[in-house]
Amino acid sequence: MNTLKSFFQCFLVIAGVFWQSGYANTDEINLWAIGTAWAPDKSDVLYREYHFAEDPDLDLTTRVEYRRPDGSVFAEKAIDYSRSQTAPEIQHIDYRNTARINTEFLEDARYAMIKVGFQAHDSNRYREELLTYRESVIVDAGFDPFVRKHWEQLIAGESVAAAMLVPSRLDTVEINLIKTGSHHCNGASVDIHCFVVRPAGILRVVGWFVDPIYIGYEQVSRRLQVFNGISNLRDDNDEPRNVLISFEYF
């Protein structure tokens, strides 16, 4: 389960910036979407994700603020797609604890590398590793461009393999994406295609994670509308939690 909890720290399509204060001070002109994270039974709003798109050439989030229901910011992330859309550079910080994640896309004459830095929520140790870049690698919010790149395969019902970066492992793990019934992505207000994310290979055999992750994309815009699974953010008691996130775009 520990691998599962850390795996989805890199999963959601969320981006943000580092700020020193714990409260919002944003340029609402660039507000692109708001994701409302509910408890799985929709009994409570747990937090909201304020997504900002500051690059007019991209239909992608470039930063996000994670806000409590009272509006206070408890975590933020910045994202840079300039070197790779599916393996972007990210900077993530959680103000409630010591958790942080950084990635850097490195290029030289021979091959590209990804530098990964990770610090756990309950540790003062910051760890780094260099990984060889592959086209199948997904880093954090690079999941959206990956889905769009393989859109026709996915909506046709084909299984698409990927290597998802797991910052806590300083490594990637193999996953498969495949289309599933839209009822798994309940909460969407528009027509969507629903996909399920599962572990691949030996990870599937040993039951690497128990609960599937469902992601729903709007059929025309190809934007994420629903996320149903374990959150990339722990609760205020540093415990993992499942969420149902619905997105509204502006």
Where are these regions (language model features)?
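Bacterial N-terminal signal peptides
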Residues: 9-18
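Sec/Tat signal peptide C-region and signal peptidase I cleavage site
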Residues: 19-25
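Contiguous hydrophobic, core-forming segments of folded domains
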Residues: 72-155
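Solvent-exposed helix/loop surface patches that form functional interfaces
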Residues: 117-196, 203
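Acidic, serine/threonine-rich low-complexity disordered tracts
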Residues: 25-83, 92-94, 100-107, 163-250
